[in-house]
Every structure is written in C-alpha cells, then in structure tokens.
From Swiss-Prot:
It comes from the Bacteria. The gene is rnpA. The lineage of its organism: Bacteria, Bacillati, Mycoplasmatota, Mollicutes, Entomoplasmatales. It comes from Mesoplasma florum (strain ATCC 33453 / NBRC 100688 / NCTC 11704 / L1). InterPro entries: Ribosomal_Su5_D2-typ_SF, Ribsml_uS5_D2-typ_fold_subgr, RNase_P, RNase_P_CS. This is Ribonuclease P protein component. Keywords: Endonuclease, Hydrolase, Nuclease, RNA-binding, tRNA processing. It catalyses: Endonucleolytic cleavage of RNA, removing 5'-extranucleotides from tRNA precursor.
Length: 110
C-alpha cells in the first residue's frame, strides 16, 4: 500500500506553523520544520476567502499535482511542510503557480 505522507491533523499543522520558519511569495506561503520520521510530509491549507468548496478543492488538487512533480525531483529529506494558498494563486495560470512553488522549494532547500 502506498504511503501518501500527508499531514492531516490540526495539531500537526499548528505545531509546524508555530515554529515560524517560512518562505512566501505572491501565490503561496510555505511553513516548514524538521521531522524525525526520515521522510517528507506535506499538508495543504486553503482558506474560505479563496472561494466555495469546489474552488478550494480544485486548488488543493492543483497543489497536490505540483508537489508530486517536486517529490520526483527532490532527494529524500525529512521535513514537514505546510503549503498555504494565497489570493494571487487564483489569478495565475497553473504553469505560473508551478513556477512560483518551484522557486519557494528551491529557496527552502538552501
């Protein structure tokens, strides 16, 4: 069975965000913290201000696709990452959003 490595619990989100280690740009905010699990985990947060449930789920699906592309490229590293979508993401195309997320991941890895 495939392990999705997704953060789902609210207390895990709060723990990562409370450490105040983040990078941001116009479309996304990425909070991160080192974990001791030995593998990468991620969580996605989309606020209600970005639209109705259909729109928010579409955004989450797009971010998951962007992350899947990143996982193939990146080596294994043990971090927990929370990706928060911002309003600007709605105005950009999928390709522009993917470039923005790639820039943040590169900045995060440095």
């Amino acid at each position: 069975m495939k392990n999705k490595k997704i953060i789902k619990k609210n207390f895990e989100f709060q723990e990562i965000i409370s450490k105040q280690e983040f990078h941001r740009n116009s479309a996304f905010v990425i909070y991160y913290s080192k974990n001791d699990k030995g593998y990468f985990r991620y969580g996605i947060s989309v606020g209600k201000k970005l639209g109705n449930a259909v729109t928010r789920n579409k955004i989450k699906r797009q971010i998951r696709m962007m992350i899947q592309d990143q996982i193939k490229i990146l080596p294994e590293f043990s971090y927990d990452i929370v990706i928060i979508a911002r309003n600007r993401m709605m105005q950009n195309s999928f390709d522009q959003n993917q470039k923005e997320l790639n820039k943040l991941v590169v900045r995060f890895l440095k």
